[in-house]
């Protein structure tokens, strides 16, 4: 797949999922207060990983991911309609550990005491 086309699909997927969650089109009560960070489409264009986070416990995290994965068909249909895709990638929602780690690192650095005598 063309890299420019791939980035366009990934960006539109992030935008579409975020807007559908914010606008309330996803009726699943497990899906709320979710941040969509990035998407990665496979080389063949058949699968897409969508990375998300939310402020919740580990137990609730599983429910959030389950709710998103159960609504993936709705996201896929909307994305296909917006981009006119012949093959719509199957969306798989994953917790964005990389984003969480970068936040933790930023917080750690800002809280680091400085010695100014």
Swiss-Prot record:
GO terms for cellular component: cytosol. Gene3D superfamilies: 3.30.300.20. It comes from the Bacteria. It is found in: Cytoplasm. GO terms for molecular function: ribosomal small subunit binding. Its main location: cytoplasm. One of several proteins that assist in the late maturation steps of the functional core of the 30S ribosomal subunit. Associates with free 30S ribosomal subunits (but not with 30S subunits that are part of 70S ribosomes or polysomes). Required for efficient processing of 16S rRNA. May interact with the 5'-terminal helix region of 16S rRNA. This is Ribosome-binding factor A. It comes from Leptospira interrogans serogroup Icterohaemorrhagiae serovar copenhageni (strain Fiocruz L1-130). The gene is rbfA.
């Amino acid at each position: 797949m063309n890299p420019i086309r791939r980035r366009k699909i990934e960006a539109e997927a992030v935008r579409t999922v975020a807007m559908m969650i914010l606008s309330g089109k996803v009726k699943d009560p497990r899906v709320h207060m979710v941040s969509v960070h990035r998407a990665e489409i496979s080389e063949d264009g058949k699968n897409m990983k969508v990375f998300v986070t939310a402020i919740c416990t580990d137990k609730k995290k599983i429910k959030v991911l389950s709710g998103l994965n159960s609504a993936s068909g709705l996201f896929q249909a909307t994305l296909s309609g917006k981009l006119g895709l012949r093959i719509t990638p199957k969306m798989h929602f994953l917790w964005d550990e990389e984003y969480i780690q970068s936040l933790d690192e930023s917080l750690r650095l800002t809280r680091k005491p400085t010695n100014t005598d």
